[in-house]
Amino acid sequence: MTTTLLRTADELHARVRHGRRAVVMTMGALHEGHATLIRTAREIAGAEGEVVVTVFVNPLQFGRGEDLDRYPRTLDADLKIAEAAGADVVFAPSADEVYPGGEPQVRISAGPMGERLEGAFRPGHFDGMLTVVGKLLHLTRPDVALYGQKDAQQLALIRRMARDLNFGVEIVGVPTVREDDGLALSSRNRYLAADERRTALALSQALFAGRDRHAAQEALRARAREVPATRARAEALSAIGESRAAADAHAVAKATPAGTSGPAAVRCAARLVLEEAARLQPPLVLDYLGLVDPSDFTEIPDDFTGEAVLAVAARVGTTRLIDNIPLTFGAAS
């Protein structure tokens, strides 16, 4: 199968469509994470459908002092990856094609959710992201659009935009793809020197420490519910402060203040890893660590039940990285 490169919306609209059209939006510099999105899109579209991959480095998403000029542009390599993963079309428009009158005067506002976490550190970023996603949805006219869960706040905002503005497109989130050592795949990973990459592992390690802490608490609560309300049950509950879900989380569990549980314990376990990474050379410089409700990205309270996202952003050298994992908090016993 040969992937077709298109540069204009007119070329894309002229294609005869059969079945569903699935779109994967990227800024290029494709890697295995993008390939996973494309393969998933191929499964959704089916043999009779069409998979379109957009490649567009959107200037509206980059703030002053960010890495627009050095963001990698590797279209030839991107075409090969997209073709191998099953894309029918790579749509790589110019800035003039997407913004024919220059930067748009009217933009889509991300609202309060877009001002939290990433939005607090990158003012205007989500407005620019939603504006180009909205334009690309209009230009590509898909039945379904797929986005990686690594950018959890972006995914949540796109879902909200599609719902609030009646875009009539199904939005699908695809799980984060990681290297063998846990580092989330990102186009920006190529900026990292070897020593910076070792420090960058602290992002995923912090998330895993929080996840393991949470799993240990849930396991002990489940065990305690099975024990009669006697001294044995009390001992099982009090053991939370010294238990661990895995051997490599034991030091974190020991360091967590006595009596800390629930979301507070998850935050504490993750933060301990990040604080240790801040003492490395080169150091990890934390932007934020949040344990949030994915519906609005506000911090969850200690009595929270339901789905949550543990998210982190940090800089190593000149490279800024983000990561997150989902967690589920059950009803208290």
From Swiss-Prot:
InterPro entries: Pantoate_ligase, Pantoate_ligase_C, Rossmann-like_a/b/a_fold. It catalyses: (R)-pantoate + beta-alanine + ATP = (R)-pantothenate + AMP + diphosphate + H(+). The keyword Ligase applies. Pathway: Cofactor biosynthesis; (R)-pantothenate biosynthesis; (R)-pantothenate from (R)-pantoate and beta-alanine: step 1/1. One of its GO terms (cellular component) is cytosol. ATP binds at residues 27-34, 148-151, 177, 185-188. GO terms for molecular function: ATP binding; pantoate-beta-alanine ligase activity. Transmembrane segments: none annotated. Its EC number is 6.3.2.1. The active site is at H34 (proton donor). The reaction proceeds by a bi uni uni bi ping pong mechanism. Belongs to the pantothenate synthetase family. This is Pantothenate synthetase. It comes from Streptomyces avermitilis (strain ATCC 31267 / DSM 46492 / JCM 5070 / NBRC 14893 / NCIMB 12804 / NRRL 8165 / MA-4680). The lineage of its organism: Bacteria, Bacillati, Actinomycetota, Actinomycetes, Kitasatosporales.
